[in-house]
């Protein structure tokens, strides 16, 4: 089943402890997520990323729907694997600031559908 952006908006409330989305959104503990689907990792303007996030972006990580789905259950494990698989295992250390995990697959599909409504 595909994601439902209306349900995704409700799921996104869990994310709002650290993130904002929309035309007037500002960075908080986490970066603004307006336009995140399709964006390169680690490049939201004005946000100070962890070294691990920077390494993933430099290794070519883009936030496709598939990558977001794979990231949300365990952000650190996903980023470390991406950086290692890209041939830079020495950069696959440290951690992202994102400690929240979203293990439920349908909730992830719904929140990705919601994020897509704010992306080109």
From Swiss-Prot:
Q: Residues where Pyrrolidone carboxylic acid occurs?
A: 1
Q: Does the keyword Transport apply?
A: yes
Alphabetized Pfam families for the sequence? Cytochrom_C
A Gene Ontology biological process in which this protein takes part is: photosynthesis
Top-level taxon in the UniProt lineage = Bacteria
Q: Which InterPro entries match?
A: Cyt_c-like_dom, Cyt_c-like_dom_sf, Cyt_c_1A/1B
What's noted about post-translational modification? Binds 1 heme c group covalently per subunit.
- Keyword match Heme: yes
Record's keyword terms, sorted: Electron transport, Heme, Iron, Metal-binding, Photosynthesis, Pyrrolidone carboxylic acid, Transport
Q: Which GO terms describe its molecular function?
A: electron transfer activity; heme binding; metal ion binding
Binding-site residues for heme c, renumbered to this chain = 15, 18-19, 98
The record's comment on protein family reads: Belongs to the cytochrome c family.
* Protein task: Cytochrome c2 is found mainly in purple, non-sulfur, photosynthetic bacteria where it functions as the electron donor to the oxidized bacteriochlorophyll in the photophosphorylation pathway. However, it may also have a role in the respiratory chain and is found in some non-photosynthetic bacteria.
Any idea what this protein is called? Answer: Cytochrome c2 iso-1
Origin species, per record, is Rhodospirillum centenum (Rhodocista centenaria)
Q: What is the lineage of its organism?
A: Bacteria, Pseudomonadati, Pseudomonadota, Alphaproteobacteria, Rhodospirillales
């Amino acid at each position: 089943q595909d994601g439902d952006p209306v349900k995704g908006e409700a799921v996104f409330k869990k994310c709002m402890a650290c993130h904002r989305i929309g035309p007037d959104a500002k960075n908080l503990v986490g970066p603004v997520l307006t336009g995140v689907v399709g964006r390169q990792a680690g490049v939201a303007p004005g946000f100070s990323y962890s070294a691990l996030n920077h390494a993933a972006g430099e290794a070519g990580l883009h936030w496709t729907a598939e990558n977001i789905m794979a990231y949300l259950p365990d952000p650190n494990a996903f980023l470390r694997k991406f950086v290692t698989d890209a041939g830079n295992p020495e950069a696959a250390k440290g951690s992202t600031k994102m400690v929240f995990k979203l293990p439920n697959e349908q909730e992830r599909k719904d929140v990705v559908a919601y994020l897509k409504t704010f992306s080109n």
